[in-house]
Regions:
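Structural signal for interior beta-strand "rungs" in well-ordered beta-sheet cores
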Residues: 3-185, 189-190
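Terminal amphipathic alpha-helical/low-complexity segments used for targeting or macromolecular assembly
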Residues: 1-7, 12-13, 18-19, 55, ...
Length: 270
């Protein structure tokens, strides 16, 4: 059974799993589900229509499930869905979705770290194993794919997409889509090479990393336009997950991808 501090406010119809801990002055509304082993620390707030997985921790001052900051919201029932093993640090905020977006739900995957004062707006989708560093804000309907990291105080424009395994430096303005597997920084946001360290940590081989680098050299450093670059990649590289992820991401980009800096990426692959 759940362990609820007598000074916490928990609606009797809220569904709390086994061994859930709720600290003093935490506030949990009626239409909330919290998975086994999760901890809701003092002064955390969880509003209606939130479903949280197992072994999550919500730190003091965090607010989950507040209505979206969207003028199109008309009081409809929308949701926040959070996976397992998610850490939501001090004063982070996650808003519900809106039906006007066509989504109606804000999603956080498994094994995600939202550091202090991060903001996840309505209808965003944050994938598995992502890190949003302190003071990051992602606007409505932003998609952050698996294993992406966004550096502190960076902000993402509405409808942006950040590719898997991408690493974005601190203090950046994200107003274009960030392709998978890359490093980027500066203002305006600029391609700065392949995320070699991150890919190694996740078990990518030297050959895989080299192929990724060679593909981005064609995209950013060869003078090709995007369509020609993708055609050369499709015809010049054997089929692989990495090749297909890069091609599909760029072809489906609605905002266009970030610019290149006109020089080779740094770092040793071997």
């Amino acid at each position: 059974m759940a362990n609820i501090h007598p000074l916490a406010t928990v609606h009797p119809n809220a569904k709390l799993g086994e061994n859930v801990e709720v600290g003093p002055y935490a506030y949990i509304e009626e239409h909330v589900e919290i998975g086994d082993g999760s901890k809701i620390l003092p002064h955390a707030t969880i509003f209606n229509y939130v479903k949280m997985g197992k072994n999550c921790t919500v730190f003091p001052g965090a607010v989950i499930g507040a209505i979206p900051q969207d003028l199109k919201f008309d009081g409809e029932v929308t949701y926040v869905e959070i996976g397992d093993n998610v850490n939501i640090r001090e004063c982070a905020t996650i808003n519900r979705g809106t039906k006007a977006s066509g989504r109606g739900v804000t999603k956080i995957g498994n094994n995600v770290l939202l550091m202090s004062y991060t903001h996840v707006a309505h209808d965003c989708c944050v994938g598995n194993n992502c890190i949003l560093v302190s003071y990051v804000g992602i606007a409505g309907e932003t998609d952050v794919d698996d294993w992406a990291t966004i550096g502190g105080s960076s902000v993402a424009h509405q409808f942006s997409r950040i590719g898997k395994h991408a690493f974005i430096g601190g203090g950046c303005k994200i107003n274009k889509d960030v392709p998978p597997y890359i490093l980027c920084g500066r203002d305006p946001l600029t391609y700065a090479g392949v995320n070699i360290v991150g890919l190694r940590r996740r078990g990518f081989t030297s050959d895989q990393i080299r192929n990724i680098k060679d593909m981005y050299d064609i995209i950013y450093n060869s003078g090709n336009n995007v369509s020609d670059a993708l055609a050369k990649i499709e015809s010049g590289f054997l089929q692989s997950e990495e090749r297909d992820v890069i091609i599909d991401f760029i072809r489906n980009s609605k905002r266009g991808i970030i610019r290149g800096m006109g020089s080779d990426s740094k770092g040793s692959i071997d």
